[in-house]
Each structure stands twice: as structure tokens, then as C-alpha cells.
Amino acid sequence: MATKIDKEACRAAYNLVRDDGSAVIWVTFRYDGATIVPGDQGADYQHFIQQCTDDVRLFAFVRFTTGDAMSKRSKFALITWIGEDVSGLQRAKTGTDKTLVKEVVQNFAKEFVISDRKELEEDFIRSELKKAGGANYDAQSE
């Protein structure tokens, strides 16, 4: 059965993360049968990491605040998590299903495909987003 996505519900969750006035900094998109739907959301990145277990595949849209004291900016990451125990067929489908998620999640600085929990560490993601951001005008603090 072909995978579908609940676009309206996923778009509402996506916009909640994009809203700087919202405390929500992450949302997951999970499989409910053959349909991708919004999953959990929250204001604590560590709580997001707890969603990424070995038997799960999910997509996540996460907001990080970067920059220095003079210039704070929101950077967004699209994370595809594929747990170690996910079957080969489901792994393969995750790649094609991501195109459905990208119909909703269109603005992000960097995309990650992760199956190792170490790569979910906040410092790693932040450093990758900083690299993707181009020029570093924060040199005086280094």
C-alpha cells in the first residue's frame, strides 16, 4: 500500500515549530499504518532524542537558535531517524516517503539521515547547521 501524508495536520505542526513565539522547538512525523501523521512535539531537545529508539523510523523538524549575543537566528533541521532494528524494506521506503514530508517541510538549513544516537547530540547538529550557514561573523568569540 502506498504511503500517504496528512498534509493539513503535518503543516499545522510544522508551522508551530517555525513560529518564534511558540515554545515548541521540535515535532516528529510518524507512521500510522500507511499514513504519515504528526507525532510528539516539545520544547526540550532531549525529549526528542528519547523518541528515537532502535525499532522506530520517523522524521523530525527541529528549530535551533544560533548566532551571537548581537544577532540570534533560528535555523531549522529536517532529521530522518532510522533505528538499528528497522527492516531493510522499511529503510528503503523511508527514503521515498521523505518526499511526502518535504511537500510540507520546505524550509530547513540542513537535512540529516541518522541511525546512530551519537549523531543526534545537540552540539553535533548545531555545529553542522553553523557550517551550513556559510560565513562565520562570530570570530571575536573564538
Curated annotation (Swiss-Prot):
| Domain of life, per lineage | Eukaryota
Ranges where the record places region Flexible and important for F-actin binding: 66-75
Keywords tagged on the record: Acetylation, Actin-binding, Chaperone, Cytoplasm, Cytoskeleton, Nucleus, Phosphoprotein
PTM Phosphoserine: at which residues?
141
The chain residues annotated with the modification N6-acetyllysine are: 102
Q: Where in the cell is it found?
A: Cytoplasm; Cytoplasm, Cytoskeleton; Nucleus
Output the Gene Ontology cellular-component terms.
cytoskeleton; cytosol; nucleus
Q: Does the keyword Transmembrane apply?
A: no
Q: In the record, which positions carry N-acetylalanine?
A: 2
Gene3D superfamilies cross-referenced by the UniProt entry? Severin
Q: Which residues belong to any copy of the ADF-H domain?
A: 2-130
Q: Where does the protein principally reside? A: cytoplasm
Any GO BP annotation: defense response to fungus
Listed GO molecular functions?
actin binding; enzyme binding
Per the record, the similarity remark reads:
Belongs to the actin-binding proteins ADF family. Coactosin subfamily.
The job of this chain, per UniProt, is described as: Binds to F-actin in a calcium-independent manner. Has no direct effect on actin depolymerization. Acts as a chaperone for ALOX5 (5LO), influencing both its stability and activity in leukotrienes synthesis.
How this chain assembles, per its entry, is: Interacts with 5-lipoxygenase (ALOX5/5LO) in a calcium-independent manner. Binds to F-actin with a stoichiometry of 1:2.
Q: What is this protein called?
A: Coactosin-like protein
The species this protein was found in: Mus musculus
